[in-house]
């Protein structure tokens, strides 16, 4: 009996010992030692078996990562860095599903691994491109590797951009040259890695800077000739223009450095090249003024003062059209350049200064108790029958000259009796002066002077046109219409020499055939119609706030439909019509198709944008144009189906269903040739791959 009790006691002790061992967590990582040994194969005496910054317990119980693999998702970022520093998913190599692994985004492209729309801040040419520092990426020494990558992956010094002092930054060694950032001579040949880089071509991108200068001095990309995409080579920026090769707009004036140097001839280091108080970009893009001329309209006020102080028009020398230029009003007469009658006496400032010699700032210049305007109204200085005030304010005639147009009729007679124009000696443009017509008894309003027969004396004696040809100059307007209606020259098909015939101007474009620039935008009507395809009746045809003439001055070097300035803004190549070589010009991509001119396959379906538009008719912005479950690229390159037809063989099954679900021939409506369409067989639960066979 005593033996039995001894045996039971021994069994009980052993059980307690086992329970004690099984309940033990030696390293305090949240996993029992027995589980670490038998289940997870981790070290029960090391809380972080894979040294990734997460305890084994956290990896198993919270994050479901591998406690023996410091980088569970193989994205080149340790699990601990992902959880503790970046906030990315340590089990998903591409946390934001943008097609780039988290490691590539953090260590190579320097984009946000949690934002699918984040963009790189340097040349997308590879890891050697030096980019601006992003604090969230934590790159203390700006060597192109995050501190976490340096410490946890490469074991380099996160505070030394060139840990092995070989002349190459740690980032360049890892991402571009694939050399050892901790070994100055990775191949042990006696020549440092920095000295070996491109030994026969010291300037890899041909930008005028050696690779060593780009890496060590300027932080530019030795494989990208124009690191900031401003249209100037990095070497040209550093050595010639002294601009920042990492900043496309060195002076922050709204114009790219390349545009300033190449097109506008402004100073890319001075935001206000003409020192007129307006930034160069503001002058070109907003006001249409000349960034190299401080006084674009030559009115005596600089452009900046006109815009910022006086609120006058920097392109109009007489903003209030009172006959006195803005500068004279401000600096000489001290009148208001935006008010044609500064003293409100009823006489425009110009008339007071130039005609009446009164004070434009004093409504009663002679202090006689009668306003200047009233005094002028009562006076007829030239005795032509029109008060001086009416001559100035209504008819714009000379109050000191009774016959302003020297046609033999007084201004008063023309206005009151004959209703002819006192400023036009030949009101009806028939070649006979108004005074002559009154003298001989003809009508100064009627250009037709009847003779015996059907011909007119005007045609025979004055205009020289052919009385037997109703359209002497073949411009599309009859001679009568030209003389009597439009006041154009019946012998000159293009009276205003603007490049459009008078008939085209009147009948087609509705422009003024006597005015070469109908909309006053600085471009002739012919140039607008024939060259620039702009509206000759609208000074800003595209309503973008920039006058047509200013836009016409902007160069389109590659003829892709985008101005070089716009290309700098869109970061395309202004000297290459198709920057991404996808078969569509940059202009067509931006203005028409809304695709990415720097990505030859905008929707990532495996088919270049140009082929989608020009060859297959598919949508370059939709990877699956016909929504059949197959990408356009798969349809074109693999299955030879129609990417714009969801059911290429019209059998009642979509191409995607045939390929991925039923494994039938998406190009053959009856895969088994049994006389029944694949779709009908699926509906009838028969096998579309076997003749009349039930599934």
Swiss-Prot record:
One of its GO terms (cellular component) is endoplasmic reticulum. TSP type-3 repeats lie at residues 24-38, 47-56, 70-82, 184-196, 202-214, 248-260, 294-308, 317-329, 340-352, 363-375, 379-393, 402-414, 425-437, 470-482, 493-505, 516-528, 539-551, 555-569, 600-609, 623-635, 646-658. Keywords: Calcium, Endoplasmic reticulum, Repeat, Secreted, Signal. Residues 59-70, 589-603, 665-679 have a biased composition (Basic and acidic residues). Residues 1-20 form the signal peptide. Gene3D superfamilies: TSP type-3 repeat. Residues 45-695 are annotated as: Disordered. GO terms for molecular function: calcium ion binding. Its main location: secreted. It is found in: Secreted; Endoplasmic reticulum. It comes from the Eukaryota. Residues 271-283, 291-306, 313-324, 361-370, 381-392, 467-477, 491-500, 537-546 have a biased composition (Acidic residues). The keyword Repeat applies. May function as a calcium-binding protein. This is Calcium-binding acidic-repeat protein. It comes from Euglena gracilis. The lineage of its organism: Eukaryota, Discoba, Euglenozoa, Euglenida, Spirocuta.
């Amino acid at each position: 009996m005593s033996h039995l009790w001894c045996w039971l006691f021994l069994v009980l002790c052993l059980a307690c010992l086992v329970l004690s061992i099984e309940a033990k967590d030696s390293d305090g990582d949240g996993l029992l030692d027995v589980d670490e040994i038998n289940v997870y194969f981790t070290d029960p005496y090391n809380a972080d078996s894979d040294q990734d910054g997460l305890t084994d317990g956290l990896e198993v119980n919270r994050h479901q990562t591998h406690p023996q693999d410091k980088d569970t998702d193989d994205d080149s970022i340790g699990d601990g860095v992902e959880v503790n520093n970046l906030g990315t998913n340590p089990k998903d190599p591409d946390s934001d599903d943008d097609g780039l692994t988290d490691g590539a985004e953090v260590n190579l492209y320097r984009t946000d691994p949690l934002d699918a729309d984040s963009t790189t801040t340097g040349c997308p040419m590879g890891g050697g491109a030096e980019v601006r520092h992003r604090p969230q990426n934590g790159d203390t020494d700006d060597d192109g590797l995050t501190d976490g990558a340096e410490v946890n992956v490469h074991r380099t010094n996160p505070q030394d951009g060139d840990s092995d002092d070989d002349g190459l930054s740690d980032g360049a060694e890892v991402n571009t040259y694939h050399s050892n950032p901790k070994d100055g001579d990775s191949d042990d040949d006696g020549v440092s890695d920095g000295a070996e880089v491109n030994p026969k071509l010291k300037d890899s991108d041909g930008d005028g800077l050696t690779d060593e200068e780009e890496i060590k001095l300027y932080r530019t990309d030795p494989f990208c000739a124009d690191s900031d995409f401003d249209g100037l080579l990095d070497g040209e920026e550093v050595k010639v223009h002294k601009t920042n090769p990492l900043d496309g707009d060195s002076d922050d004036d709204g114009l790219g450095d390349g545009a300033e140097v190449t097109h506008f001839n402004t100073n890319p280091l001075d935001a206000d090249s003409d020192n007129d108080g307006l930034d160069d970009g503001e002058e070109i893009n907003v006001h249409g003024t000349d960034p190299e001329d401080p006084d674009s309209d030559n009115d005596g006020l600089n452009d900046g003062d006109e815009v910022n102080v006086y609120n006058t028009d920097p392109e109009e020398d007489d903003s209030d059209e009172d006959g006195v230029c803005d500068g004279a009003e401000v600096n000489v007469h001290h009148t208001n350049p935006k008010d044609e009658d500064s003293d409100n006496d009823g006489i425009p400032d110009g008339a007071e200064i130039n005609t009446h010699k009164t004070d434009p700032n004093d409504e009663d210049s002679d202090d006689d108790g009668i306003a200047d305007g009233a005094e002028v109204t009562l006076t007829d200085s030239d005795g032509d029958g029109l008060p001086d005030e009416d001559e100035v304010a209504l008819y714009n005639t000379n109050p000191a000259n009774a016959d302003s147009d020297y046609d033999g009729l007084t201004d008063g007679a023309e206005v009151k009796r004959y209703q002819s124009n006192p400023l036009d000696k030949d009101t009806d443009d028939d070649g006979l002066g108004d005074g002559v017509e009154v003298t001989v008894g003809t009508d100064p309003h009627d250009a037709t002077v009847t003779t015996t027969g059907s011909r007119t004396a005007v045609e025979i004696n004055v205009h020289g046109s052919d009385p037997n040809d109703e359209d002497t100059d073949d411009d599309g307007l009859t001679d009568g219409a030209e003389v009597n209606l439009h006041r154009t020259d019946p012998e000159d098909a293009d009276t205003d020499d603007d490049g459009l015939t008078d008939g085209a101007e009147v009948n087609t474009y509705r422009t003024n055939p006597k005015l070469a620039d109908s909309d006053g935008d600085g471009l002739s009507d012919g140039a607008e119609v024939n060259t620039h395809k702009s509206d000759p009746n609208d000074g800003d045809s595209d309503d973008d706030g920039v006058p047509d003439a200013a836009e016409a001055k902007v160069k389109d070097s590659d003829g892709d439909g985008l101005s070089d300035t716009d290309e700098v803004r869109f970061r395309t190549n202004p000297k290459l019509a198709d920057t991404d070589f996808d078969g569509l010009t940059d202009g067509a991509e931006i203005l028409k198709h809304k695709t990415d001119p720097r990505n030859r396959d905008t929707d990532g379906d495996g088919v270049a944008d140009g082929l989608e538009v020009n060859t297959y008719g598919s949508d370059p912005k939709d990877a699956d144009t016909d929504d059949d479950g197959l990408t356009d690229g798969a349809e074109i390159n693999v299955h030879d189906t129609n990417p714009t037809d969801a059911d290429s063989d019209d059998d009642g099954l979509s191409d995607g269903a045939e390929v991925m679900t039923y494994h039938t021939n998406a190009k053959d409506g009856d895969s088994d040739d049994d006389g029944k369409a694949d779709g009908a067989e699926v509906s009838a639960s028969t096998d579309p791959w076997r003749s009349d066979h039930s599934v």
